[in-house]
């Protein structure tokens, strides 16, 4: 059984920090999957094609693990 670890995440919109939090997961990969789902949902809440939404994950020692930036996706076309 793996022991849970804590990861810090910071979400930015167009370079400005808008939220910070802690992800609790047993592995880095699990934290990354959760963050992808969260960031994807968050990006849909911003203006498509103009807003850049990014997320940075570090471990509790402050070691940088990943940072990704997404252009907020365009809405799905209506049929």
Language model features with spans:
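Short, mixed-charge low-complexity intrinsically disordered segments
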Residues: 40-79
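Short acidic, gly/pro-rich beta-turn/loop elements at beta-sheet edges
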Residues: 18, 33, 67
